[in-house]
Structures are given as structure tokens and as C-alpha cells.
């Protein structure tokens, strides 16, 4: 193969790879916006005023054993204990740190009524690590969510 032809193939291959990477980034492959789930619920991560938040959109068990809608019974504010868990905005304030990480947010745990500092980090296009912590991130818990089918960023 002639050396100039080899260089042309290398340049064409490089440009094709660069174009595919650019298209992948532009289509939201690195965006957490959309639907996510864990073993208990489905969540929607959304953008509001340039920051990310999340709300509960479905529960595996939406009612109590008595058949009543689950409410925020552990909230430290008694006036909020009757609000439904379904639709609850429980994460807020996340700012983008990198293409895969959002920080400086908070996460509210309706099972305990506690609010924690939090960050999110994408682990590929279909997994996100959500870490809630007190003080420093070494003291906390990480939950892994998977992107819900059809929940891609559009």
C-alpha cells in the first residue's frame, strides 16, 4: 500500500471515530436526565433552573398494608407528613462537575425523614451511582440506579 494512501486511511478512521464520539455526546449519552429505577421505585431526573433534581414517579408498593397511599410520615415537619410519596421531589440542587458527575445536591430519605448531601455519577449510559452522605462523602451510602427502559434523555 502506498504511504500516502495509508495516511489517508488513518486520517479517515480518526475522523470517523471523532464524529461518532461527538454524535454520542450530543445525543445525551452522558446525561442523567430521564427515568431511572432501583428495587423500590422509578425516579425522574429533571433540570430546573440549570440544576438537576429528581422526583418519585412510581413505587413498587404504592400503598400501605391497609391499602392507603404512602405518605411522608417520617418528615420532621409535621405539616408535610400527609404529602404523597408518589410525585415527591426528593433530590435537588445538583450542579454539573464533569461530563459524568453532578455535585452539591441534597437527597431526602422518606423512610427516615433525613436529608443528606449527595452527588451523582454516571457509570456508563444505563447506570448511575447516587451517594448520600453526612459531612464528607466517605461516610455515606451509594445506591446504583439503572436507566428505565425508554427513559433515555430526549
Question: For the regions a protein language model found, what residue spans apply to each?
Answer:
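N-terminal secretory signal peptides that target proteins for export/translocation
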Residues: 1-5
Amino acid at each position: 500500500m502506498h504511504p500516502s494512501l495509508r495516511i489517508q486511511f488513518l486520517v479517515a478512521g480518526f475522523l470517523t471515530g471523532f464524529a461518532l464520539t461527538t454524535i454520542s455526546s450530543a445525543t445525551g449519552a452522558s446525561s442523567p436526565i430521564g427515568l431511572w429505577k432501583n428495587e423500590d421505585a422509578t425516579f425522574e431526573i429533571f433540570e430546573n433552573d440549570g440544576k438537576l433534581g429528581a422526583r418519585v414517579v412510581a413505587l413498587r408498593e404504592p400503598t400501605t398494608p391497609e391499602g392507603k397511599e404512602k405518605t411522608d410520615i417520617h418528615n420532621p415537619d409535621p405539616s408535610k407528613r400527609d404529602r404523597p410519596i408518589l410525585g415527591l421531589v426528593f433530590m435537588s440542587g445538583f450542579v454539573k462537575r464533569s461530563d459524568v458527575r453532578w455535585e452539591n445536591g441534597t437527597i431526602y430519605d422518606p423512610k427516615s425523614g433525613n436529608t443528606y448531601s449527595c452527588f451523582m455519577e454516571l457509570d456508563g449510559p444505563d447506570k448511575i451511582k447516587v451517594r448520600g452522605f453526612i459531612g464528607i462523602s466517605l461516610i455515606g451510602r451509594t445506591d446504583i440506579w439503572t436507566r428505565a427502559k425508554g427513559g433515555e434523555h430526549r
